[in-house]
Amino acid sequence: MLIFISNMEELLIENSQRFTIFPIQHPECWNWYKKLESLTWTAQEVDMCKDIDDWEAMPKPQREFYKQILAFFVVADEIVIENLLTNFMREIKVKEVLYFYTMQAAQECVHSEAYSIQVKTLIPDEKEQQRIFSGIEKHPIIKKMAQWVRQWMDPDRNTLGERLVGFAAVEGILFQNHFVAIQFLKEQNIMPGLVSYNEFISRDEGVHCSFACFLISNYVYNIPEEKIIHKILKEAVELVDEFINYAFDKARGRVPGFSKEMLFQYIRYFTDNLCFMMQCKSIYKVGNPFPQMTKFFLNEVEKTNFFELRPTQYQNCVKDDAFAFKLFLNDDDF
């Protein structure tokens, strides 16, 4: 581990005199935590009953495209959780930041559960489910992306600043195009449950990504050189390009609402915004190819009354009775 550098970082310095969160010593970080706390939701609070008919009516090439996205998501969130639990939450000593990452880890667990529910609901065939749940083994590009994430999260090879840049790239660049692709289903007025999940998860991930950028700009002493930041971000973009090509090949190039060239441009537009948040020069200097979805891109999805969304007929949507029973236990069952 890079001790000679890491020991200079305020985030990693133990305060032996501080045992409680109050009095707050880092109010901006505390505000980030409270913002994240306000977004709390659970995976059971989205109804996917209508999605089953929409999914079955969807052309097979389009279904194949979205299956690749689900395969990525079920793997990616687990790797994010792994990094939080084994690295950041063990290393970070500033309590307000640690509170944020504790809340983020809980949210990522909700996201992971939500993706599993989506797979179980939409894909009844158990062998096909397993192919999606085993994304790293079955999809070479997903394995490559997972290896890249673990490479940049490794504390023995990278400074804290480099790892935070990599973390922002994961939460932002690697996820963003997939969020956009799912959101286009809303314009087709189909898959309302999947779209609702997507809006809640993308909103959460937007906060996670922005917080990483905030720490880089305000707390990291050893900020990576701009060329290193650009290297990390460009590597992430190249991986996304490769995934998009792979997913479009599976869909035989037919996905309603957008082309892969539009997704290529969008991820570069998004990456330039990340550069701005990290106080770096932009890399690609391209416009937004999806101006009609600006509100979604800015994570301005209105907070929903989740009690109104709480489903009452989920057992009819999930074809695995044992799985459904486990999902819908209430407090009286414990």
Curated annotation (Swiss-Prot):
<dbReference type="GO" id="GO:0039693">
    <property type="term" value="P:viral DNA genome replication"/>
</dbReference>
<dbReference type="GO" id="GO:0009263">
    <property type="term" value="P:deoxyribonucleotide biosynthetic process"/>
</dbReference>
<keyword id="KW-0479">Metal-binding</keyword>
<protein>
    <recommendedName>
        <fullName>Ribonucleoside-diphosphate reductase small chain</fullName>
        <ecNumber>1.17.4.1</ecNumber>
    </recommendedName>
</protein>
<feature type="binding site">
    <location>
        <position position="77"/>
    </location>
    <ligand>
        <name>Fe cation 1</name>
    </ligand>
</feature>
<keyword id="KW-0408">Iron</keyword>
<feature type="binding site">
    <location>
        <position position="111"/>
    </location>
    <ligand>
        <name>Fe cation 1</name>
    </ligand>
</feature>
<feature type="binding site">
    <location>
        <position position="208"/>
    </location>
    <ligand>
        <name>Fe cation 2</name>
    </ligand>
</feature>
<dbReference type="GO" id="GO:0046872">
    <property type="term" value="F:metal ion binding"/>
</dbReference>
<keyword id="KW-1194">Viral DNA replication</keyword>
<dbReference type="InterPro" id="IPR033909">
    <property type="entry name" value="RNR_small"/>
</dbReference>
<feature type="binding site">
    <location>
        <position position="205"/>
    </location>
    <ligand>
        <name>Fe cation 2</name>
    </ligand>
</feature>
<feature type="active site">
    <location>
        <position position="115"/>
    </location>
</feature>
<dbReference type="InterPro" id="IPR012348">
    <property type="entry name" value="RNR-like"/>
</dbReference>
<comment type="similarity">
    <text>Belongs to the ribonucleoside diphosphate reductase small chain family.</text>
</comment>
<keyword id="KW-0244">Early protein</keyword>
<dbReference type="InterPro" id="IPR000358">
    <property type="entry name" value="RNR_small_fam"/>
</dbReference>
<keyword id="KW-0235">DNA replication</keyword>
<feature type="binding site">
    <location>
        <position position="171"/>
    </location>
    <ligand>
        <name>Fe cation 2</name>
    </ligand>
</feature>
<feature type="binding site">
    <location>
        <position position="108"/>
    </location>
    <ligand>
        <name>Fe cation 1</name>
    </ligand>
</feature>
<comment type="function">
    <text>Ribonucleoside-diphosphate reductase holoenzyme provides the precursors necessary for viral DNA synthesis. Allows virus growth in non-dividing cells. Catalyzes the biosynthesis of deoxyribonucleotides from the corresponding ribonucleotides.</text>
</comment>
<dbReference type="InterPro" id="IPR009078">
    <property type="entry name" value="Ferritin-like_SF"/>
</dbReference>
<feature type="binding site">
    <location>
        <position position="108"/>
    </location>
    <ligand>
        <name>Fe cation 2</name>
    </ligand>
</feature>
<dbReference type="InterPro" id="IPR030475">
    <property type="entry name" value="RNR_small_AS"/>
</dbReference>
<keyword id="KW-0560">Oxidoreductase</keyword>
<dbReference type="GO" id="GO:0006260">
    <property type="term" value="P:DNA replication"/>
</dbReference>
<dbReference type="Pfam" id="PF00268">
    <property type="entry name" value="Ribonuc_red_sm"/>
</dbReference>
<dbReference type="GO" id="GO:0004748">
    <property type="term" value="F:ribonucleoside-diphosphate reductase activity, thioredoxin disulfide as acceptor"/>
</dbReference>
<comment type="subunit">
    <text>Heterotetramer composed of a homodimer of the large subunit (R1) and a homodimer of the small subunit (R2). Larger multisubunit protein complex are also active, composed of (R1)n(R2)n.</text>
</comment>
<keyword id="KW-0215">Deoxyribonucleotide synthesis</keyword>
